[in-house]
Design a protein with these regions (language model features):
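Nucleotide-sugar donor-binding/catalytic module of glycosyltransferases
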Residues: 4-6, 11-181
Length: 181
């Protein structure tokens, strides 16, 4: 279903350090989580690790995750007893091996080039943090709502000089963060 990414002969994805690790907290999301996994496995950035943290789900979320992990070795499963969102995120970040961390909620469906574009900007300008816009889509509507359309995209800015940009898009899942930061 998804290619494992490029690596040297005999080297598994577990040996090669990815550029980006995407942490996904999971708790009882069996119904819509496969669409999120499809979006992550279809990313144009192949040098990607998907760290899925199962927070003691009581539905079939873990089974869905295990099935996907058999198809794509970039998926790393962290299975733990339920301890809440914050603890799950901390476990995922600790397990992540990438130089940059992305966060995706299980009901998010990132566009195919999201992480490639964010990583390119982060590397080109040596950024600790890169943010992006997002669309909202509701099951009962056909349209997508673009948030923050008037913001300056594709430009560098100092968050001290323009704090409204960081404060207005505070969602952790709209960015890429240098792990060492």
């Amino acid at each position: 279903l998804c290619n494992a990414g490029s690596r040297k002969d005999g080297e598994s994805m577990q040996d090669a350090l990815p550029s980006v690790s995407v942490v996904v907290p999971i708790y009882n999301v069996e119904r819509y989580f496969p669409q999120c996994l499809e979006a992550l496995c279809s990313q144009t950035l192949r040098d990607l690790e998907i760290v899925a943290v199962n927070d003691g789900s009581t539905d079939g979320s873990l089974s869905v995750l295990q099935e996907w992990a058999r198809k794509d070795e970039r998926i790393v499963i962290v299975d733990k007893p339920n301890s809440g969102y914050g603890a799950s995120m901390n476990c995922g970040i600790e397990a992540a091996r990438g130089a940059y961390i992305g966060i995706v909620e299980p009901d998010d469906f990132p566009e195919r080039d999201m992480f490639k574009r964010l990583l390119r900007m982060a590397q080109r300008h040596d950024c600790d943090l890169v943010k992006c816009n997002f669309f909202e889509h509701y099951e009962d509507r056909d349209d997508r709502i673009r948030n923050f359309a008037d913001f300056p995209y594709g430009r560098l800015f100092d968050p001290v000089e323009q704090p409204r940009i960081v404060c207005t898009i505070p969602a952790v899942w709209t960015g890429l963060y240098r792990k060492a930061w």
